[in-house]
Amino acid sequence: MKTIKIKEGLPISEILKKYPDLVRPCLISQNPPKIDLKNRDALAVYNKLVAREILGVELSLHPKALVPSIMSRLEFVKLTVKPHETVLDVGTGSTAICAIIAAKILGAKVYATEMVEEYYLNAHINIIQNSLQDRIQLVKSSGQIIDGVIPEDLNFDAIISTPPYLPSKVKPLGKKFGGSAEELLGGGKTGAEFSLKLIKQGAPHLKRGGRIGLIIPMKKETVAECITHAMKEEKLRVQNIRLITGNRERRIIIGKKN
């Protein structure tokens, strides 16, 4: 398995100098300056500033939603999407960050779906305030994944998602880190049910050479095995990538159509 290591984003000392009023309340240490990245509010401030400074993107974060790691999402999209492609982002979330990266950084035409009403509205705000409404078409789903949401004759160079991965019986950790059941519960005994449906429904929508890319926590080995098997069942060539961002490890799984 290929391993990629990337930096967390920006040095705390650097953003403290530029945004002292925003960063100082998040500090747990002054010398050297450190942010408590286990605190959701501090994590939100940090990633909003990373998005602004590195991507030139302004993000509005929904107070109940998961806070995405900007650098890991950037690397994920760059590994899965090529410049100027047509992309489907399934479950874009309240920030629509993967769709925004694909559209703004790679010049892609993106169809982004979201089923949670509050997240859909927040994603719309982010698309508008970054002037990407001509490149991103936001679609409200009603619990469907791809079938019934995307026209049958619409095909893509890449289908991407940060899928839910917890089994149905697991209680989400939303009170501490944010995240609705839709963001966290992948369904079934393993938590892979959402991903398996996405692969089965998405494969027929891939152009030749098209890719399905999913990113999950590195420790979710059973989910990864289920995803890999499902991609192979759809005759996709599978690549697993270990992505290390700071102290966090994620697995990117890419299935490519021949």
Regions found by a protein language model. Give the residues of each.
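Short, glycine/charge-rich beta-strand/loop segments that flank catalytic centers
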Residues: 62-72, 89-93
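Conserved Class I SAM-dependent methyltransferase catalytic core
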Residues: 42, 46, 120, 190-250
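N-terminal auxiliary segments of SAM/dcSAM-dependent transferases
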Residues: 1-66
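Phosphate/oxyanion-binding active-site loops and adjacent basic polyanion-contact surfaces
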Residues: 68-73, 191-195
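C-terminal lobe and adjacent flexible extensions of AdoMet/dcAdoMet transferase-like proteins
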Residues: 249-258
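Mobile active-site "lid"/loop adjacent to the S-adenosyl-L-methionine
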Residues: 161-197
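Conserved alpha-helix/loop element of class I SAM-dependent methyltransferases that forms part
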Residues: 49-53, 70-85
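Conserved SAM/SAH cofactor-binding pocket of Class I
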Residues: 78-173
